């Protein structure tokens, strides 16, 4: 027995020495010479630290913020939670069609391989059975669940207007995203605009795009929510008959209503007006409507599927909606700030689980805000809780991409001993590279967070340095 104990302790000592050497090499890597580095690796079986470096330092996290958002959503709402969007007739005005938004980010989404237009086809078929072809009808889209501050005030101008920074509202459609197509075959700048998909009839583009010969996509669309003026800058590849970049739909609720109107008109139903609740909301006007007969109900996929999309594909749009629905469940007043209520609940919930949030500064649910900050120790504690205490442990673990296999980790740790054995979320914005998740290899069961800010090397050099460190564990 004593010999076995001695052997076990000796092996542990060897493992720790390897980890410490791996940490030393990471910190001395030339790509990180001027960087801020925070690391925490915790043994999930014992709760003890395997290796750490400045674990309490608050650093910019980028998309590993989604670990917090997705974990909190699962704990509050459950893995089977579903958004429900209803189309009803208005009892107080029989000529008014109501679309009642629930904050579902998946309406018309192509993420899950569904027919993106099925929502409109099914509603049209259902309404044709209820409406009279000789009467005129209006559409009122109730999209005010989260209010109309759809983006974080801490997002940067370079992001606003692009698809990955789309607004979050009570109604979404087509991932709140459109494609803008160009013809660059003439190799003359600015390239000719061909079309948008879906057809964004109202948007006016000011085109400052130039062309490159590298084949890289550096095109960006700038513009604020609810404005139809968009500026296009940057550069895109020359010599293409068609090339597209993506932007955010300025007013998703109105676009959904107008698209539904087009479907109804083509089916023989007369539509005289399309409105959203925005004007009435901003005027604090109490609109009298009474949902009557439910004509169509659309139920989203369960939360477990949505969370997996958030973490595997790093879907900002879904993550932002999750944080706001968290907030709205805590404060049902539609004039309260759903984003701030969500942030407040995140802090409250994790404090209740005995995890200090003193290092946490949160401005969104996706990690796009560069002012977000928290410590590696904080996030690793959440990971440990989700693995050892949460009833959603398996759902959460399965939502994280596998190293060398899928999602944002497809090329990370590929062809190494830990391929498929690390399940983690990556995070990267300018000068930031982070990884947070689990290493499960037999009896070796670790939660880890690696956060690197303001590195001077290339991103590939930093990723390689992190891979070498993880291989030392």
Model-found features: residue ranges?
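Short glycine-rich loop/turn motifs
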Residues: 36-39, 307, 319, 433-436
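Bacterial Sec-dependent N-terminal signal peptides
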Residues: 1-22
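Conserved serine DD-peptidase/penicillin-binding transpeptidase domain
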Residues: 26-27, 76-357
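Beta-lactamase-like hydrolase cores
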Residues: 18-58, 77, 121-133
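A short glycine/serine-rich beta->alpha loop
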Residues: 54-59, 246, 368-369
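Small-residue-rich helix-loop
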Residues: 50-52, 313, 323-473
């Amino acid at each position: 027995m004593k010999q076995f104990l001695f052997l076990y302790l000796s092996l542990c000592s060897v493992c720790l020495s390897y980890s410490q050497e791996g940490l030393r090499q990471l910190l001395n890597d030339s790509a990180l010479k001027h960087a801020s580095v925070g690391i925490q690796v915790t043994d999930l079986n014992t709760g003890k630290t395997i290796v750490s470096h400045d674990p309490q330092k608050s650093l910019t996290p980028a998309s590993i913020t989604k670990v917090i958002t997705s974990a909190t959503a699962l704990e509050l709402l459950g893995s089977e939670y579903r958004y429900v969007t209803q189309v009803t007739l208005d009892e107080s005005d029989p000529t008014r069609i109501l679309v009642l938004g629930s904050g579902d980010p998946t309406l018309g989404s192509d993420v899950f391989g569904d027919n993106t237009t099925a929502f409109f086809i099914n509603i049209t078929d259902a309404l044709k059975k209820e409406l009279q072809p000789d009467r005129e009808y209006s559409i009122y889209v109730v999209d005010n669940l989260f209010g109309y501050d759809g983006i974080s005030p801490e997002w940067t101008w370079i992001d606003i207007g692009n698809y990955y920074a789309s607004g979050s509202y009570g109604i979404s459609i087509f991932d709140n995203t459109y494609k803008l197509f160009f013809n660059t075959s003439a190799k003359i700048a600015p390239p000719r605009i061909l079309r948008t998909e879906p057809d964004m009839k109202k948007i006016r583009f000011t085109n400052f795009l130039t062309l490159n010969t590298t084949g890289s996509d550096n095109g960006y669309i700038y513009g604020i929510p609810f404005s139809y003026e968009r500026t296009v800058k940057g550069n895109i590849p020359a010599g293409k008959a068609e090339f597209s970049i993506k932007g955010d739909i300025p007013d998703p609720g109105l676009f959904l209503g107008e698209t539904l109107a087009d479907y109804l008109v083509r089916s023989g139903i007369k539509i005289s007006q399309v409105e959203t609740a925005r004007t009435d909301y901003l005027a604090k006007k109490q609109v009298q409507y009474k949902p009557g007969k439910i004509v169509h109900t659309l139920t989203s996929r369960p939360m477990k599927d949505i969370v997996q999309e958030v973490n595997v594909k790093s879907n900002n749009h879904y993550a932002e909606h999750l944080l706001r629905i968290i907030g709205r469940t805590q404060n049902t007043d539609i004039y309260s700030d759903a984003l701030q209520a969500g942030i407040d609940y995140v802090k409250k919930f994790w404090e209740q689980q005995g995890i200090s949030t003193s290092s946490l500064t949160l401005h969104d649910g996706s990690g796009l805000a560069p002012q977000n900050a928290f410590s590696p120790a904080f996030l690793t504690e959440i990971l440990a809780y989700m693995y050892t205490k949460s009833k959603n442990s398996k759902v959460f673990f399965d939502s994280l991409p596998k190293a060398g296999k899928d999602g944002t980790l497809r090329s990370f740790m590929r062809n190494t001993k830990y391929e498929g054995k690390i399940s983690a979320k990556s995070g990267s914005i300018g000068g930031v590279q982070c990884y947070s998740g689990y290493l499960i290899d037999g009896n070796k069961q670790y939660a880890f967070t690696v956060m690197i800010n303001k590195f001077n090397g290339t991103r590939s050099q930093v990723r390689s340095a992190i891979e070498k460190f993880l291989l030392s564990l």
